[in-house]
């Protein structure tokens, strides 16, 4: 619960450690709103207040010092209420996120468009946007979420053509960790490849830290951002003479335990066919064999090792590469103007 300041801040710190850059907290009641000032003060991340139904909670959240407020045009109330939130946000110099959701569209939108029309979702967002613009307020972020991937993608594509404000993208109510990650990867991956999206969230019914991990995996997969090492591995087949599944899992765990944020590609391959050749772009990797394996670096074989020590031998090379990359990063930082001694 948001009103539990200690628990909320503990979760925010975990998210920050995982790489989260903005955090949104639900503000369902006055007790939660009253806790916001302490949460904002103790949070290492910008705090966004998520407001539904009770517009006065938005005013309390803004007064508490939140960095952004999110309102839902489907349930926040009439134009006069939106105007009051705008006035408070302008006084504080914070943006407003307009969040249209396919599951809570205004009645007049449903009557005109139904519930599965991207035009209806975009129009639901445009209604409060026009009110904000009429008040001369343009510090706006827009989202239009749906749990249906196709509907969400089509809505964001239409919004990108019609709305001149930053877009926060996501697939809402995506599901459990596995299903939700797949749905989010499909939908957000398409949008990101098209250059659509300024901020993003992967919504999962899971530990929220898993949302951050999934988001970085999606960003890495489309070549936008990479945070920390990436372990790639091939599917097992009849050529594989090693416990590839167990090997890949162990390597993932060992690499995660390093806690490094340095980008690094590590390959775990089942045989010489998929080894140094197909994974030649990996910084370092292993290719399994019968009771043995090959350690390779950028496609070049370094040495043959025993199966019993293959993970330890790989990690030795991983740590060498990390040290080299750390030294390169330090040298590059020192060479920048104003950073030298």
Put a short name on every predicted segment.
Residues 50, 98, 142, 191, ...:
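Conserved, mostly hydrophobic/aromatic
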Residues 1-7, 26-28, 45-53, 109-122, ...:
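Active-site mouth loops of central-metabolism enzymes
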Residues 30-51, 84-96, 156-167, 251-256:
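Alpha-helix-loop-beta-strand connector modules within alpha/beta enzyme cores
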Residues 7-15, 27-64:
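N-terminal active-site wall of soluble small-molecule enzyme domains
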Residues 45, 56-97:
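Hydrophobic or amphipathic alpha-helical targeting/insertion segments
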Residues 101, 109-256, 261:
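Catalytic alpha/beta core domains of metabolic enzymes, predominantly
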Residues 63-77, 81, 108-120, 301-304:
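Glycine-rich tight-turn/loop motif centered on a GG-T
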Residues 22-29, 46-53, 69-77, 121, ...:
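Catalytic beta/alpha-barrel core
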């Amino acid at each position: 619960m948001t009103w539990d300041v200690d628990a909320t801040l503990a979760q925010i710190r975990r998210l920050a450690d995982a790489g989260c850059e903005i955090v949104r907290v639900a503000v369902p009641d006055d007790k939660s709103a009253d806790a916001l000032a302490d949460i904002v003060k103790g949070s290492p991340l910008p705090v966004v207040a998520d407001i539904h139904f009770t517009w006065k909670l938005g005013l309390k959240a803004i007064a508490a010092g939140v960095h952004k407020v999110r309102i839902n045009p489907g349930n926040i109330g009439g134009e006069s209420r939106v105007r009051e939130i705008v006035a408070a946000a302008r006084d504080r110099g914070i943006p407003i996120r307009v969040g249209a959701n396919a599951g809570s569209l205004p009645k007049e939108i449903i009557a005109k468009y139904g519930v599965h029309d991207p035009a209806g979702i975009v129009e639901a967002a445009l209604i409060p946007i026009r009110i904000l613009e009429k008040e001369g307020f343009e510090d706006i972020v827009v989202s239009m979420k749906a749990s249906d991937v196709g509907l969400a993608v089509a809505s964001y594509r239409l919004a990108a053509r019609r709305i001149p404000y930053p877009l926060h993208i996501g697939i809402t109510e995506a599901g459990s960790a596995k299903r939700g990650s797949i749905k989010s990867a499909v939908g957000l991956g398409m949008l990101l490849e098209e250059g659509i999206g300024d901020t993003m969230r992967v919504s999962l019914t899971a530990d929220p830290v898993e949302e951050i991990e999934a988001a970085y995996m999606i960003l890495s997969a489309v070549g936008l951002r990479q945070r920390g090492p990436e372990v790639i591995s091939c599917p097992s087949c009849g050529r594989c003479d090693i416990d590839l599944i167990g090997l890949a899992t162990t390597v993932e765990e060992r690499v995660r335990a390093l806690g490094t944020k340095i980008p690094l590609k590590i390959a775990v391959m089942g045989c010489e066919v998929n080894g140094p050749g197909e994974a030649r772009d990996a910084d370092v990797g292993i290719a399994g064999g019968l009771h043995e394996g090959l350690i390779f670096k950028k496609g070049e074989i370094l040495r043959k090792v025993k199966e019993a020590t293959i993970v330890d031998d790989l990690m030795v090379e991983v740590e060498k590469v990390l040290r080299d990359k750390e030294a390169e990063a330090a040298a590059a930082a020192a060479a920048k103007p104003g950073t030298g001694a």
